Amino acid sequence: MGCIKNENATQAETGQNGLDFNPYDIMEPRAPGKTPKNMQNGAPVKTHDVAPQGVYQPDYNILTPHMRSPEYVQMSTAAAITLGVNKGRMYRCSCTRCLNLLLTYPEGCRANCAYCGLARHREAERDYADRNFIRVDWPAVPMDVIVDKVASDGAGSPFHRMCISMITHPRSDDDTVAVLKKWTSRIDPETIPVSILSNPTTMGREDVKLLKDLGADIFTVALDAATPELFDRTRGKGVQSPHKWAKYWEVLEDARDIFGPEKFGVHLIAGMGE
């Protein structure tokens, strides 16, 4: 017995004449909308200043508590399930091996990348900690809780790597250092290595070196867009965002020099018009 029903449908043509092909001009990013002043820079969250109570699960129906890194970080749903702060099970496996940590602030990320769920132009839609990042919820968890849980597992920890993801915010560089120090004060980076997903816009060579000196093992740069033109169009001036192709490459080359072969990398997204 089969469960596939033949609907007499034929496969659409592939390539430039296919239904799923999006020409470059159609993929032009929408102009960022104007956010009302009373919704800018996390104003509702900061004005009401609701104290957080432990782990925060994204909820669009309530005002988000006032949470900031380095005391709080967000993590992927898969990481939260594996850590034990979220209920749930994952298809075909019992856990994720990488603990992804994302810096968080009421003001949110001050960049405005066209495709990102955390972009500045979305700040009127939802509080920052409620926004969808990479399609799933990212609960906010006290850093102390994370370190306590991972340290208590010792050699039996399900995590094989931890990654700190920076955002574009004035505190991001210093708070990445604080999160890294808190982690390495309790957890040996030789046991669970640490990666940095960087924000080159706010960084210099000394920032890269400091992270290496503090125990980071791998340093990555999210170029995302594969060409200078696409980068500027989707992450730079084209969307009123501060990122610059040349600056990203400058920091990437710093990482090459400081972290060495096979210890630095780039994130790219296919399908943005390249």
Q: Language-model segments: what does each one mean?
A:
Residues T176-S185, T220, G273-E274:
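Short, electropositive alpha-helical surface patch
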Residues G265-G271:
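Short, conserved beta-strand edge motifs with alternating hydrophobic and charged residues
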Residues H121-V145, S152-D175, E190-D207, L211-W249, ...:
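Core AdoMet radical
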Residues T227-P228, G271-G273:
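Short, catalytically relevant binding-site loops at active-site mouths
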Residues C3-E7, G18-F21, E28, G33-N112, ...:
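N-terminal [4Fe-4S]-dependent radical SAM core
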Residues L180-P189, K212, L252-G260:
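Surface-exposed amphipathic alpha-helices with a cationic face
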